[in-house]
Amino acid sequence: MYISSPHTSHFTSIDRSPAVVSESDRSMEEAAAAADMNGGVHQSRFRRVCVFCGSSSGKRRSYRDAAVELGKELVARKVDLVYGGGSLGLMGEVAEAVRNGGGHVIGVIPTTLMGKEVTGETVGEVREVGSMHERKAEMARRSDAFVALPGGYGTLEEVVEVIAWAQLGIHAKPVGLLNVDGYYDFLLAFVDKAVADGFIPPSHRHLFVSAPDAPSLVHKLEEYVPV
């Protein structure tokens, strides 16, 4: 575990190169050819997946179970986790699941939240930044795809922002909602309403995918073709 301060002049523990999957070195065809069939799970075409989620666990056990299942799915596919750096709630659940499975965890957290979202030992490598804006930008830069578990205002803002970035052509990375027990039905209904009323182009309804469980969602992310 290594914590970098925003005042640290040189951070060597984490590779700063963008986590971009190029057509030349990590194409879908190569990923399929290099499929890891252990447990019937294919190795992913992603190096790192960013997970947005709550610093609370929610009232349903299914939310925590989904976070753990997602972490195990990433480990099975040999995908690193990028997340908000906290040890509480669903953030802690998914990070612990990845670390306990032998996967690599990269957390990005503002200095002001260290005392609020971290208790005890941090999970994996922690990159400490100066602001929420830096946190979101760094998480996005390091990731090849995005997943939103259930969460509150912060989670909703984070996932909607990366969908908006896709709409603006800022990135072409897959975005997925892990719709546990219909948690994101309201957001799906909102998007359908916005499309019907002319605020979102029909083609942009497909800027993200959703599924009720981690294996199904990750499969959709793997198959995603940018709009």
Swiss-Prot record:
Pfam families: Lysine_decarbox (PF03641). GO terms for biological process: cytokinin biosynthetic process. InterPro entries: LOG, LOG_fam. Its EC number is 3.2.2.n1. Residues 1-26 are annotated as: Disordered. Residues 1-15 have a biased composition (Polar residues). This is Probable cytokinin riboside 5'-monophosphate phosphoribohydrolase LOGL9. Disulfide bonds: none annotated. Belongs to the LOG family. It catalyses: N(6)-(dimethylallyl)adenosine 5'-phosphate + H2O = N(6)-dimethylallyladenine + D-ribose 5-phosphate; 9-ribosyl-trans-zeatin 5'-phosphate + H2O = trans-zeatin + D-ribose 5-phosphate. Expressed in roots, leaves and stems. Keywords: Cytokinin biosynthesis, Hydrolase. GO terms for molecular function: cytokinin riboside 5'-monophosphate phosphoribohydrolase activity. Cytokinin-activating enzyme working in the direct activation pathway. Phosphoribohydrolase that converts inactive cytokinin nucleotides to the biologically active free-base forms. It comes from the Eukaryota. One of its GO terms (cellular component) is cytosol. Substrate binds at E117, R135, K136, G152, Y153, G154, T155, L156, E157, E158.
